Swiss-Prot record:
Its EC number is 2.6.1.9. GO terms for molecular function: histidinol-phosphate transaminase activity; pyridoxal phosphate binding. Homodimer. Its cofactor is pyridoxal 5'-phosphate. The gene is hisC. This is Histidinol-phosphate aminotransferase. The keyword Transmembrane helix does not apply. The keyword Amino-acid biosynthesis applies. It comes from Christiangramia forsetii (strain DSM 17595 / CGMCC 1.15422 / KT0803). GO terms for biological process: L-histidine biosynthetic process.
Length: 350
């Protein structure tokens, strides 16, 4: 990109803010030696009576070791939706700026656009679920602040071609957000290792998918020091609670079990794909780098209701662009997948 300057993108009112600073930050190293009577907490120690570390230092340090990215390039949030919302609030002027999204894609980009009163310019993926570069560049205006790329994409499951992503990063002078919620199920490399090459790059990940902790709500954002510093100005002081910080550290110190689970899910994905090919009302199975499969069936609404009657909840995506008569199926355990295939076979014979 030419002459990229993050200070030209940030909202003026945000540029003048200072990040929240806890009065205790300067006493961190002294810890137990100090008597803390500053924050009106309950003084009786139960392990959770104190406010959590607002900078989540221990989690960032371990995550840095795991992902190979400096702690200074990491921001944590209450789920990925919070860090995505922070990007809107830091860089987009309500009623003036616009963002570009590529349907079919993750629905929260549009929701956050609407909440923040930002125009959402939708550019459909092509029929291979790949970005249409010509159409994207035609939609860019002087007020386009962000392009959102979900890769691996939800609901299609495919990873976008690296060459196309790189071209967007190089030609667009705004921010490019790559949502990698499903990256651990893919053989593609994460874009976090290209942060130094592209100052306009933001990558988001989550603990909800491969790490199996949707219940703790922890989202991760990786970007340049400058972008992280701007987002820290508007981040709520204690946005990641102590229980979440403790649980996330347990996960990061036990990644071998996570890797085994991911390998099992990928193996089940392959098995399930082959079995679904044999079902007569399944017309197409899309290639997936995620923990789900998008399949095309004869009548999605009918099949969705039939699975509900059998006690199996899947996702009907047929109301999304390019997804007519498509169902999205999460890869379950071996036992759950067997029940799913059994239901498919029963419906096939009805």
């Amino acid at each position: 990109m030419k002459d990229f300057n993050i200070n030209k993108l940030v909202r003026p009112n945000v540029a003048g803010l200072k990040p929240y600073s806890s009065a205790r930050d300067e006493f961190k190293t002294q810890g137990a030696e100090m008597v803390f009577l500053d924050a009106n907490e309950n003084p009786n120690d139960n392990g959770l009576n104190r406010y959590p570390d607002p900078q989540q230092t221990s989690v960032k340090e371990k995550l840095s070791e795991t992902r190979g990215v400096s702690p200074n390039n990491i921001l944590l949030g209450n789920g990925s939706d919070e860090v995505l919302d922070l990007i809107f609030r830091a860089f987009c002027e309500p009623g003036k700026d616009n963002v570009i999204t590529l349907p079919p894609t993750y629905g929260m980009y549009k929701v956050l656009s609407d909440i923040n009163n930002i125009e959402n310019r939708e550019v459909l993926l092509n029929h291979d679920f790949e970005p249409d570069l010509t159409a994207i560049f035609k939609q860019i205006t002087k007020d386009t602040k962000i392009i959102f790329l979900c890769s691996p994409n939800n609901p299609s499951g495919n990873s976008f071609e690296a060459e196309k992503i790189e071209m967007i990063l190089e030609k667009f002078n705004g921010l490019v957000v790559i949502d990698e919620a499903y990256i651990d199920f893919s053989d593609s490399k994460s874009w976090i290792h290209r942060l130094e090459d592209f100052p306009n790059l933001i990558v988001t990940q989550t603990f909800s998918k491969a790490f199996g902790r949707a219940g703790i709500r922890l989202g991760v954002l990786y970007s340049s020091d400058e972008i992280i510093a701007i987002l820290n100005k508007i981040k709520p002081p204690y946005n990641v609670n102590q229980l979440t910080q403790k649980e996330s550290l347990k996960i990061l110190f036990n990644l071998d079990s996570i890797k085994l689970q991911v390998a099992e899910i990928k193996n089940e994905r392959t098995i399930l794909s082959k079995q679904l090919l044999e079902v007569n009302f399944v017309s197409k199975i899309y290639r997936s780098d995620a923990n789900f499969l998008l399949i095309e069936v004869d009548h999605a609404n009918k099949r969705y209701d039939q699975f509900l009657e059998k006690g199996i909840v899947i996702r009907n995506r047929s109301n999304q662009p390019l997804c007519e008569n498509c169902l999205r199926i999460t890869i379950g355990t071996k036992e759950e997948n067997k029940k799913l295939i059994k239901a498919f076979k029963e419906l096939e014979n009805e």
